[in-house]
């Protein structure tokens, strides 16, 4: 048996033989480097909270049902979710994203910096484009976590990146690298990946955002070849800052925003895996694609089947092997 064939079987079997169900904070990708990445995330999160110092009161003018109301909150501490807690339990459960001053999408768990108007967005608003885009982006982020959970360490899976959301394309995507050029997952393997997405949704994991300096991001991702290569270009476009997101212990790079929790993922299918380019003498880039509905949305089997078939078509997004500097909307979307 050739080395390439052995690698192929390793990655294939690694996906078929899924790790046992893990707790919220213990994905199968856990390792010393992952633990350190999370430690650094936690330390920086605490440092930023402690650096707030004197707490300034801000006025948040909530616009929406049941009525407009002004809330007095704590600047750089209170979040849109905290505002929702002052309104009702329903607002907390339904609000996927916030809109600040009528135009700025804002993560539900991101501290508000100054007085503003606030709208809480769900998937039933009259103009859902903004929240749908955040949902699509979150699906790609969750797919990275699901892939880490599904593949055993010996498969040597490496997450590359996920393109910005393109709802018209019919699929959300995540690009990966495997040390085999012959991976062709079957229905069983794709169902296993879909099941990992469903598990993430059931865990109702809060999605956290953290803006950090490039040097800290480099330290966090120093064991990730592709993330390390991408960070300088990202920070050049964002004044030396890098935006990170975390669910459970899975951390990745994205400018966001994303929806508040994994629980907003409803019916979901990981539908396709396309080899898009070779990487080195034995590896290859693969684009994993899927389609999903927000939780609470119902679609009959036939209609969802049409969406699933459409999502299998190769995504037109820029390919992961193209120079990162040219990918205008890749990780920065």
From Swiss-Prot:
Alphabetic keyword roster: Mitochondrion, Ribonucleoprotein, Ribosomal protein, RNA-mediated gene silencing, Translation regulation
UniProt main location, coarse: mitochondrion
Gene3D superfamilies given in the database record: 3.10.20.30, Threonyl-trna Synthetase, Chain A, domain 2
GO cellular-component term (any): mitochondrion
Gene Ontology annotations of biological process type: mitochondrial translation; regulation of translation; regulatory ncRNA-mediated gene silencing
Pfam families in alphabetical order: TGS
SUPFAM superfamilies found in the cross-reference section: ThrRS/AlaRS common domain (SSF55186)
Ranges where the TGS domain occurs: 56-122
UniProt-annotated location(s): Mitochondrion
Molecular function GO terms recorded: nucleotide binding; structural constituent of ribosome
Region (Disordered): 311-333
Family the entry assigns: Belongs to the mitochondrion-specific ribosomal protein mL39 family.
Subunit structure, interactors included: Component of the mitochondrial ribosome large subunit (39S) which comprises a 16S rRNA and about 50 distinct proteins.
PANTHER family xrefs: LARGE RIBOSOMAL SUBUNIT PROTEIN ML39, MITOCHONDRIAL RIBOSOME PROTEIN L39/PROLYL-TRNA LIGASE FAMILY MEMBER
Name this polypeptide is given: Large ribosomal subunit protein mL39
Species annotation: Drosophila melanogaster (Fruit fly)
Originating gene: mRpL39
């Amino acid at each position: 048996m050739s080395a390439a064939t052995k690698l192929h079987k390793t990655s294939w079997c690694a996906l078929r033989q899924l790790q046992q169900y893990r707790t919220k904070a213990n994905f199968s990708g856990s390792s010393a480097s992952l633990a350190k990445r999370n430690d650094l995330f936690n330390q920086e999160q605490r440092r930023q909270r402690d650096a707030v110092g004197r707490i300034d009161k801000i006025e948040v003018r909530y616009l929406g049902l049941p009525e407009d109301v002004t809330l007095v909150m704590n600047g750089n501490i209170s979040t849109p979710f905290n505002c929702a807690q002052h309104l009702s339990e329903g607002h907390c459960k339904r609000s996927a994203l916030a809109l600040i001053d009528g135009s700025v999408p804002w993560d539900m768990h991101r501290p508000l910096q100054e007085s503003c108007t606030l709208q809480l967005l769900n998937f039933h608003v009259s103009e859902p484009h903004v929240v749908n885009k955040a949902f699509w982006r979150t699906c790609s982020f969750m797919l990275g976590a699901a892939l880490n959970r599904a593949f055993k360490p010996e498969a040597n899976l490496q997450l590359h990146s996920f393109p910005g959301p393109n709802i018209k394309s019919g699929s959300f995507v995540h690009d990966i690298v495997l040390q085999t050029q012959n991976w062709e997952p079957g229905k069983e393997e794709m169902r296993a990946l879909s099941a990992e997405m469903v598990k993430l949704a059931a865990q109702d994991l809060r999605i956290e955002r953290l803006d950090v300096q490039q040097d800290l991001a480099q330290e966090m991702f120093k064991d990730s070849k592709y993330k390390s290569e991408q960070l300088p270009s990202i920070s050049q476009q964002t004044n030396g800052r890098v935006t990170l997101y975390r669910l459970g212990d899975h951390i990745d790079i994205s400018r966001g925003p994303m929806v508040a929790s994994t629980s907003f993922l409803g019916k979901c299918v990981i539908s396709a895996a396309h080899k898009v380019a070779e990487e080195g003498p034995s590896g290859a880039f693969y684009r994993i694609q899927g389609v999903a509905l927000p939780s609470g949305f119902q679609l009959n089997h036939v209609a969802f089947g049409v969406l699933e078939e459409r999502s299998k078509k190769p995504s037109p997004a820029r390919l992961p092997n193209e120079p990162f500097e040219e990918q205008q909307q890749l990780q920065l979307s």
